[in-house]
């Protein structure tokens, strides 16, 4: 089969590396891909949001299957356009991708169908939002931009002044553009965050191994929110008992709710959960593989990813048995200094071989490009260094050992990835 993966980050690199293992995967293309992906797939020029380009390339090159990985093209309707052109895909149509594309929609859906989520109100007027926050007088308070914001549209305000600034930044200063025309103001939940990605064909849900993301830029969960600075899998807080509760109260009800609304969801559905003393709650949905969660989850997958994705498209997921390794995985993100705010790019990356890899680890490329045989930084998050091990300690030890062999100007990474997972506190 000829496969096209749309996207250019570490997540896409991890998907491509997993797809490569399938006997059915004959040729893999990436549009646009990046410097490191070029070692594993044929990179094609174009933008990941250019629907016409993706459709025409797929038709002209006899592509059998397209994996649309990022949120933007999914929300814009890339899967709809490909399906209308008769091309099989992995990913939800636009009317289902709204689950991530609009936080107002997703919160209202959860409320309507009794899916546990934090108490909230939605606003399209900044003054009304500020008045509500002042009246509630509960801190911390969570303020979320309605639309897509590269994983950075959530602000946890510790007091009224911070909340006021957050509302102004999102709604008046348009920090996230039109994504901030509406906001959600919600109750802050205490607990432990868990990420669970799941394959679904709109009827059946097959959760993947759980993971723990580290969203803050700096050690000890300090600094601004990022797209993610590292992950570990599995998440030790996510027990079999909690998994069964999530399936019954969250995963299946979400899929059934979407079906009921005439928005059947096919693809990867990401559940961002908070495990509280009162049980699991949904913090957010994403309509695609998480980044960097994918970089620890897929290395633990023992089944054929392409077969699973095809079953998702053909709605035969119930017949699939998906096997997972009982090892642990850890991923440390190497970022450009100053990310996620202001950072410089174009620096040479040292310590990688000709294929962009490093001994003792798998290196997933995110913001990289190749020039004159060298790898250069080309984004905020540059590389994801992933290792597996018989225990989480061993996986983390190997990942940090590999990180020491890689360097570039202003390289920044967290030194405490997985620390919370090594000594899980019980609820």
Q: Model-derived features: where do they sit?
A:
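Internal nucleotide-binding/catalytic subdomain
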Residues: 153-294
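Generic C-terminus detector
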Residues: 368-372, 376-427
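A conserved helix-loop-beta module that forms one wall/lid of the active-site cleft
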Residues: 90-153
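Solvent-exposed alpha-helices and their adjacent loops that cap or buttress functional pockets
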Residues: 21, 36-38, 60, 90, ...
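Active-site "cap" helix and flanking loop/linker of ATP-utilizing ligase/carboxylase catalytic domains
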Residues: 247-269, 286-358, 370-371
């Amino acid at each position: 089969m000829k496969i096209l993966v749309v996207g250019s980050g570490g997540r896409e690199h991890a998907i491509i590396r997993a797809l490569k293992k399938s006997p059915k995967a004959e040729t893999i293309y990436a549009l646009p891909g990046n410097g490191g992906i070029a070692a594993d797939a044929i990179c094609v020029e174009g933008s990941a949001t250019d629907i016409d380009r993706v459709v025409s390339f797929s038709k002209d090159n006899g592509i059998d299957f397209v994996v649309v990985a990022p949120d933007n093209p999914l929300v814009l309707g890339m899967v709809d356009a490909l399906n209308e052109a008769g091309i099989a895909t992995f990913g939800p149509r636009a009317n289902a991708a709204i689950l991530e594309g609009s936080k107002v929609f997703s919160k209202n859906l959860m409320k309507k169908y009794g899916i546990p989520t934090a108490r909230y109100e939605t606003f399209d007027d900044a003054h009304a939002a500020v008045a509500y926050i002042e009246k509630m007088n509960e801190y911390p308070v969570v303020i979320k931009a309605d639309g897509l914001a590269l994983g950075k549209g959530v602000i946890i305000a510790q007091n009224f002044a911070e909340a006021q600034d957050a509302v102004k930044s999102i709604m008046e200063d348009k920090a996230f553009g039109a994504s901030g025309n509406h906001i959600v103001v919600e109750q802050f939940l205490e607990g432990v965050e868990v990420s669970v990605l799941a394959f679904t064909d709109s009827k059946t849900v097959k959760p993947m191994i759980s993971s723990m993301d580290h969203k803050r830029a700096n050690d000890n969960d300090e600094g601004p929110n990022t797209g993610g600075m590292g992950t570990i899998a599995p998440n030790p807080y996510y027990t079999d008992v909690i998994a069964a509760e999530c399936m019954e109260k969250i995963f299946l009800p979400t899929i059934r709710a979407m079906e009921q609304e005439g928005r059947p969801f096919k693809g990867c559905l990401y559940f961002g959960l908070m495990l509280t003393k009162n049980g699991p709650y949904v913090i957010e949905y994403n309509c695609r593989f998480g980044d960097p969660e994918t970089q620890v989850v897929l290395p633990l997958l023992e089944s054929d990813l392409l077969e699973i994705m095809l079953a998702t498209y053909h709605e035969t997921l119930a017949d699939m048995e998906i096997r997972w390794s009982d090892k642990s995985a850890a991923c440390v993100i190497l970022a450009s200094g100053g990310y996620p705010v202001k950072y410089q790019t174009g620096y040479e990356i040292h310590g990688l071989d000709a294929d962009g890899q490093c001994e003792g680890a798998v290196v997933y490329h995110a913001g990289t490009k190749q020039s004159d045989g060298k790898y250069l930084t080309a984004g905020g998050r540059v590389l994801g260094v992933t290792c597996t091990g018989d225990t989480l300690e061993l996986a983390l030890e190997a990942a940090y050992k590999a990180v020491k062999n890689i360097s570039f100007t202003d390289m920044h990474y967290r030194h405490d990835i997985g620390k919370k997972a090594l000594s899980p506190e019980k609820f």
